[in-house]
Regions:
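Hydrophobic alpha-helical transmembrane segments in multi-pass membrane proteins
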Residues: 5-9, 39-40, 48, 94-103, ...
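Membrane-interfacial loop-to-helix junctions in multi-pass transporters
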Residues: 1-4, 31-44, 76-82, 162-168, ...
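Hydrophobic transmembrane alpha-helices that form the pore/transport pathway of multi-pass ion
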Residues: 27-94, 100, 104-105
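Alpha-helical membrane-interface segments at transmembrane helix boundaries
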Residues: 26, 30-34, 51, 155-162, ...
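Helix-coil boundary and interhelical linker segments in multi-pass alpha-helical membrane proteins
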Residues: 109-125
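Alpha-helical transmembrane segments of multipass membrane proteins
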Residues: 49-50, 92, 103, 107-111, ...
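Core transmembrane alpha-helical segments of multi-pass membrane transporters/permeases
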Residues: 1-23, 212, 217-257
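Long, contiguous bundles of hydrophobic transmembrane helices that form the permeation core
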Residues: 121-241
């Protein structure tokens, strides 16, 4: 299980994170709930749930979202210890948030003898209840303290979010392949990794193209070459990050026998 399923899913998560999907999830959560009472804490909960779909790691989830949400919560008026607790609790839910869950979910599928897709489907309701409980807690705390949200004019625009929604295509592909049973788990992860590489290439190209003043054949070609180089570097970085992440899981699997 460790070498056929878990490692590939960890590598896929590393590739997907480098496409910029974490920033997209944070911006989406910011737009969705940032305006409400105690908005930054709700942003932390929603963004941690969304990023947990990709990482399956509590620590990685905290590092990704916490660097943005914790300072924002403190600035809004939450106590530092409460802000840290909210982020830690929300990020821990990444272990049980499908489709990419913690290593324990893969081991459950192996030992019980049921497909991983069934484990992921059964985890949807508990995961939603978990994050709903945290969301209600931060809402009640915000009402008790009388905290406001983020002004609407400072929130990301829906139009810009819609432009970047292509970043979630590899995740959608993975969910479809796993749920439909069209491919094996290993093949599903491999195809999703290739999709993440393609999406990352497009994202790098778009970023470089946006930084150019004029759109000529030369500038577009230069942006394409630069994006290819950025994508190649991202592939090596993703493989390195995936390998490092797999070491911890491999040790846990070895201890479990």
């Amino acid at each position: 299980v460790c070498y056929t399923y878990i490692v590939l899913f960890i590598i896929f998560g590393a590739f997907l994170e480098r496409t910029g999907i974490a920033n997209f999830f944070i911006s989406f959560a910011n737009r969705l709930a940032g305006w409400s009472s105690g908005g930054p804490a709700k942003v932390a909960v929603i963004s941690s749930a969304l990023c947990g779909m990709v990482s399956g790691s509590s620590v990685g989830n905290t590092v990704t979202t916490g660097s943005f949400t914790i300072p924002m919560m403190k600035k809004t008026g939450y106590k530092p210890e409460f802000a840290g607790a909210v982020e830690a609790a929300a990020s821990t839910g990444g272990q049980i948030m499908p489709p990419i869950m913690g290593a324990a979910a893969f081991l459950m599928a192996e030992y019980i003898g049921i497909p991983y897709a069934q484990v992921a489907v059964k985890a949807i309701l508990p995961a939603l209840l978990y994050f709903t409980g945290i969301f209600i807690s931060v809402h009640l705390e915000a009402k008790k303290l009388g905290l406001n949200g983020i002004p609407r004019d400072q929130l990301p625009r829906w139009r810009l979010l819609a432009r970047d929604c292509y970043l979630i295509l590899p995740l959608i592909l993975l969910v479809w392949l796993v749920s439909s049973g069209a491919k094996t788990m290993s093949h599903s992860a491999a195809y999703s990794i290739l999709a993440a590489i393609a999406v990352g290439l497009v994202n790098f190209f778009m970023l470089r193209l946006q930084s150019t003043q004029t759109r000529t054949f030369r500038t577009v070609g230069k942006a394409a070459l630069g994006a290819a180089g950025d994508s190649a570097n991202s592939v090596f970085d993703s493989l390195e990050a995936g390998a490092k992440g797999a070491i911890t899981v491999a040790v846990a699997c070895a201890m479990a026998g």
